[in-house]
């Protein structure tokens, strides 16, 4: 009888060890990728799915001028097209790039983003700014290469900023770090007033 209980106990220990190993290897739940900043703050990127959607807005567009970009972003390397409400001609936001990072800036309450994030986020805080961040890995292309996309959303003043950086999966650390650098530059740049941009 004692031998039976020893066998049951050994089996239970094996199950616990296997279970702990499975949970530690992230086979269950989401996989988080954490960027630790110089000051000790962290940004947690949660693995999610992304999908495209269409935006149904009546807008007019034009490129931001060099003077407008300098007013909003000082010396950051930005190119962007501004979106204006076609009826009242007020600016809604803009879409463009800061270096190689895609950026969409929307006035709060306006959605200019054609990307749907399917999953959970963990809110991180950097210099008092709350950031929801994540990443997505595509299926392999015909050459067997996967693309990784890191993204983040945060509010600055009266605007919501979405940034996204992509690259091949085996360079995901570089992709993540490039996006983090952009986030930090935008936070350092501070909030800006889109109402100064006229159609």
Regions from the PLM with identified roles:
Residues 25-29, 73, 78, 192:
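Short, aromatic- and cysteine-enriched interfacial helices/patches
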Residues 29, 33-35, 112-113, 117, ...:
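Hydrophobic alpha-helical bundles in membrane proteins
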Residues 144-178:
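Short, well-structured beta-strand
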Residues 47-148:
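Short, solvent-exposed recognition patches
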Residues 1-54:
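Membrane-interface helical sensory segment of bacterial ECF anti-sigma factor regulators
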Residues 26-27, 120, 156:
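Intrinsically disordered, low-complexity segments of exported/surface proteins
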Residues 165-199:
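Surface-exposed amphipathic alpha-helical segments
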